[in-house]
């Protein structure tokens, strides 16, 4: 854990330096490159048992020729292409892990850069470290998709719709579940057409419908799809399992987040503040639905990545007491989920390269 805390501290320090030089593009980007490199280095230097999904697919993608066959790929295209790219110059698995994290953090920081006039890069990096970094060491394909989706949302806020479509396509080839990003496009459109109040009431209604119907229908549909070969067998492990404690913690955290951001939305009824609440309400509904299996828990993480971006925007120039309250909640979530529960099995950190 000390390694993570050290890296987080250094990253936040460089983010602070970048914040002070935000008007100087070259210096600003240089500091962000340092942050991306540092976090990617720690990810690449880790042992193969840090993160449960390494053994599930990452190691096999890199070392098994069958996974590298583009004509018969059994896994999402982007990570296969990345593995083939690494094989051009290295057979070291750590280089592959380094580039995966560089992709994740690179796109995340690019999204923050697109919105840098509306957010604090210090808050963005702080939230990323506390809410997403350890998860990115585990659910790598989804994290690659989620970071690209952050860029899609940034372009959506900038009303650059062709780029929105382009980044949605890239996210899809990282992980097919990224189609959930369409929900944010729909929510954004509804706000533009019907206003925040009506859309907010509709979101609450749909969240309630989701909670009531999901557990009844979803896992039955998953089982039917698996039995009829409509889903690959690799998804079977996501449809079962006991995620009760993890989901209960997520429900508590979502409720804690919703309270201050509802106050912000009431005082500042802006689109980005509404999208923050939208993501939190959907996270809360999915946290309840994920009491019975992992697949919903993983889908919920898309909203976590989105909130890293929107938290940073909503809290920009907000009262310090509100900002510190949200940061304390993020720290509490990190301690419970990562330090104590070790969700994703990224703690403790070990590296044969660094001899720790």
Model-derived regions: residue spans:
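Membrane-interface transmembrane helices that cradle and orient dolichyl/undecaprenyl
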Residues: 149-163
């Amino acid at each position: 854990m000390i390694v993570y805390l050290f890296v987080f501290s250094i990253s936040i320090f460089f983010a602070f330096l970048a914040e002070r030089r935000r008007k100087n593009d070259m210096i600003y980007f240089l500091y962000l490159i340092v942050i991306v490199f540092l976090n990617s280095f720690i990810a690449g230097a880790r042992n193969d048992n840090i993160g449960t999904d390494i053994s599930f697919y990452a190691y096999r993608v890199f070392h098994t020729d069958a996974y590298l066959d583009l004509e018969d790929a059994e896994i999402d295209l982007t990570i296969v292409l990345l593995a083939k790219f690494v094989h051009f110059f290295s057979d070291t698995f750590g280089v592959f892990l380094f580039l995966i994290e560089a992709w994740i953090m690179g796109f995340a920081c690019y999204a923050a850069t697109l919105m840098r006039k509306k957010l604090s890069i210090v808050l963005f990096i702080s939230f990323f470290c506390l809410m997403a970094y350890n998860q990115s060491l585990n659910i790598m394909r989804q994290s690659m998709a989620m970071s690209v989706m952050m860029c899609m949302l940034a372009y959506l806020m900038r009303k650059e719709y062709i780029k929105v479509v382009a980044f949605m396509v890239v996210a899809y080839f990282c992980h097919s579940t990224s189609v959930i990003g369409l929900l944010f496009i729909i929510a954004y459109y509804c706000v533009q057409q019907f206003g925040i109040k009506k859309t907010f009431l509709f979101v609450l209604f749909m969240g309630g419908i989701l909670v009531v119907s999901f557990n009844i229908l979803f896992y039955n549909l998953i089982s039917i799809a698996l039995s009829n070969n409509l889903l690959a067998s690799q998804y079977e492990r996501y449809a079962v399992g006991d995620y009760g404690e993890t989901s209960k913690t997520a429900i508590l955290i979502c409720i804690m987040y919703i309270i201050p951001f509802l106050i912000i939305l009431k005082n500042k009824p802006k689109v980005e503040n509404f999208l923050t609440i939208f993501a939190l309400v959907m996270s809360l509904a999915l946290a309840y639905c994920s009491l019975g299996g992992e697949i919903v828990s993983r889908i919920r993480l898309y909203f976590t990545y989105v909130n890293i971006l929107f938290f940073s925007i909503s809290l920009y120039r907000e009262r310090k007491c509100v900002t510190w309250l949200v940061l304390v909640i993020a720290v509490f979530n990190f301690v419970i989920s990562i330090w104590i529960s070790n969700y994703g099995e990224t703690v403790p950190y070990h590296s044969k390269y660094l001899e720790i």
